[in-house]
Each structure stands twice: as C-alpha cells, then as structure tokens.
Amino acid sequence: AALDSGIQVKLNCVPQAGVNEGELEQLAALAETLPLEVRFIEMMPIGSGASMPCLAGPDVLARLQRRWPELTLLPQKPEPEFALGPAIYYKVPGWKGSVGFIAAVHGKFCAGCNRIRLTSQGFLRLCLASEAGCDLRTPLRSGASDAELLDLLRNAIREKPLEHHFGETGIPATRGMYRIGG
C-alpha cells in the first residue's frame, strides 16, 4: 500500500551471523522489482549488541557484489530538506530500488552524521554511542520560550561528539538501543 501510494519505503535489516545471514541476498533482491531501499545496518556494539554475532558492512557488501558484480556505488544524494544521511547506496542497473549500507563501526561516518534523538524522557541524545546530550523536559515543563529552546538545541548540537570510540578497550556498553531510540 505504501509503495502504491508513492511513499518512499526503506527496509532495514541488521545482518547477524547465524541468525539471518542466509536471507541477505533475498532481501537485497527485493530492490530488483520494487522501488524501495533495502538497507543493511551494522550492529552497533551498544548494550546487548556488544555481544551479538554481527556481520560487518564491508563483508555484506562483498557478498552481494559476488552475487551481483554490476552492483554500483550511487552518488550521494541529499535527502529532501536535510543534509546527507549515514547510508551509502548501491544499485544494479535496471533495478527499481537500491541497496544501502549503514556501517557505523567499519565505515565510520561520524564526521557527516546529522542525527540526534529525543528520548521519551525528554533527553536529547547527540550520538547513539555517547551519553552526551541535554535535558529538554525540564525547560519545556517550565515554560521555556521557543527562542530559549532553540538556543538550548543549538548549544547542545555544538557539543555533538566528533566520533564514536567503538573498539577502544575500557569503553562500557551503554543502554540498550531500544532505550535510546536506535
């Protein structure tokens, strides 16, 4: 129904060793006949994801390129009214859709990340891999003006971490992704 209505559809998959690795080619093949984006998202080593058997983005790409050697990198395109997102897209000539990769660990895109998240508790998270952010609930409930809230947002975003530190020893896994909007 969404595709028939012209709504852009993105189908996300987190490839996991021994869980869904046998389905990756079938998922990618959906983009052959359907105008959608099939995106493979690398498991972030956060919370329980730190101990899950994940597949690296470059390994999934190599696997799909063996199946479809003509899988070609697409030029980065800006999302409507937004800066570039974290996905890198590929397409087989003649396909209606594309295949994307979001590889936070093996394709660090921090420098170009334009994402922030607001938790259900009113905390603005600047990065999924960091506890950095600011409380927006308190000023909202205290009647802060739009200008004051905008100032808070701007100041917080200026503090957005430059990069994550996955792979460094001694970095504890933070809350589970389901608790931080990931």
Q: Could you tell me what each predicted segment is?
A:
Residues P45, H106-G107, S130-A132:
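Short, solvent-exposed loop/turn segments at secondary-structure junctions
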Residues L3-G100, A104, L140:
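Radical SAM enzyme [4Fe-4S]-AdoMet core and its adjacent flexible, acidic
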Residues A1, T33-P35, K108-F109, L124-R125:
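Short hydrophobic/aromatic-rich motifs at helix boundaries and adjacent loops
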Residues A111-G182:
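Flexible mid-to-C-terminal extensions adjoining Fe-S/redox cofactors in radical SAM and related proteins
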Residues P93-F123:
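Active-site oxyanion/phosphate-handling segment shared across diverse enzymes
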